[in-house]
């Protein structure tokens, strides 16, 4: 796998292409991964997980892959800059223009690195809000074979989430970019709310595209209006062409 580098950052997105990015945040056991899978299926987003990208990169026998593997084995954090560059590289190579970034930004350092490197404003941050009690119950009940699914480790993960990720959530809330859903319910009930949020995003993009497509006849200067009327008189409007 090629390294994420400056050239990747500079060449994406292509000129004139609109990229849609949504962050998805939730505590351990909140069900955000399940909701991401449903969003991908319903709305055609590409699902990106910082953790998955790091684990994938660590498989390669390269200087960067070895460094990531060693840091992860030692329980140390990988630099935010590297995480962001891996995310951006994955976006560039995906061929899609809509991305769900799962579990990111995890902290304020992640957020700053994203803003400094990528320069694409997220549409919003989707927060799957779930109580500690419900998340704990789900993690203990699931059978994923994870070594860290014991009560003490689970509670430490909750504490880390509270301390590091809540400031990120508050940041986007102040900017009017927080979309929060109640994650304590059944999967399909949660997705009804999630679906409504993404349907609204789709509608905004459709209307935005129509507004950006050109001036109305009344907004044109007289010369442009004359050409517009001449064209429509010769070839008919779109509505006439359909009839």
Swiss-Prot record:
Residues 141-149 are annotated as: LID. Its EC number is 2.7.4.14. GO terms for molecular function: (d)CMP kinase activity; ATP binding; CMP kinase activity; dCMP kinase activity; UMP kinase activity. A ribonucleoside 5'-phosphate binds at residues 55, 76-78, 103-106, 146, 157. CMP binds at residue 110. GO terms for biological process: 'de novo' pyrimidine nucleobase biosynthetic process; CDP biosynthetic process; UDP biosynthetic process. Binds 1 Mg(2+) ion per monomer. GO terms for cellular component: cytoplasm; nucleus. The keyword Cytoplasm applies. Keywords: ATP-binding, Cytoplasm, Kinase, Nucleotide-binding, Nucleus, Pyrimidine biosynthesis, Transferase. Coiled coil: none annotated. It is found in: Cytoplasm; Nucleus. Residues 49-78 are annotated as: NMP. Its main location: cytoplasm. The keyword Kinase applies. Pfam families: ADK. CDD domains: ADK (cd01428). ATP binds at residues 29-34, 142, 185. It catalyses: UMP + ATP = UDP + ADP; CMP + ATP = CDP + ADP; dCMP + ATP = dCDP + ADP. Its cofactor is Mg(2+). InterPro entries: Adenylat/UMP-CMP_kin, Adenylat_kinase_CS, P-loop_NTPase, UMP_CMP_kinase. Catalyzes the phosphorylation of pyrimidine nucleoside monophosphates at the expense of ATP. Plays an important role in de novo pyrimidine nucleotide biosynthesis. Has preference for UMP and CMP as phosphate acceptors. Belongs to the adenylate kinase family. UMP-CMP kinase subfamily. Monomer. This is UMP-CMP kinase 1.
């Amino acid at each position: 796998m090629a390294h994420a580098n400056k050239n990747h950052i500079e060449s994406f997105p292509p000129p004139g292409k609109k990229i849609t990015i949504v962050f998805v945040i939730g505590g351990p056991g909140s069900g955000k991964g399940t909701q991401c899978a449903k969003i991908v299926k319903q709305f055609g987003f590409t699902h990106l997980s910082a953790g998955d990208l790091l684990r994938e990169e660590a498989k390669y026998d390269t200087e960067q892959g070895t460094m990531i593997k060693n840091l992860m084995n030692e329980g140390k954090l990988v630099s935010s800059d590297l995480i962001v560059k891996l995310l951006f590289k994955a976006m560039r190579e995906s061929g899609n223009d809509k991305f769900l970034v799962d579990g990111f930004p995890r902290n304020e350092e992640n957020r700053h690195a994203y803003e400094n490197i990528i320069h694409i404003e997220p549409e919003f941050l989707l927060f799957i809000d779930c109580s500690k009690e419900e998340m704990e119950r789900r993690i203990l009940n699931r059978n994923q074979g994870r070594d860290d699914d014991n009560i003490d480790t689970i509670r430490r993960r909750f504490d880390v989430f509270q301390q590091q990720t809540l400031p990120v959530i508050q940041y986007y809330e102040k900017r009017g970019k927080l979309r929060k859903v109640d994650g304590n319910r059944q999967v399909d009930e949660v997705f009804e709310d999630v679906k409504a949020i993404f349907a609204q995003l789709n509608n905004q993009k459709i209307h935005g595209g129509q507004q950006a497509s050109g001036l109305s006849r009344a907004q044109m200067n007289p010369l442009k209006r004359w050409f517009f009327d001449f064209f429509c008189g010769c070839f008919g409007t779109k509505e006439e062409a359909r009839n």
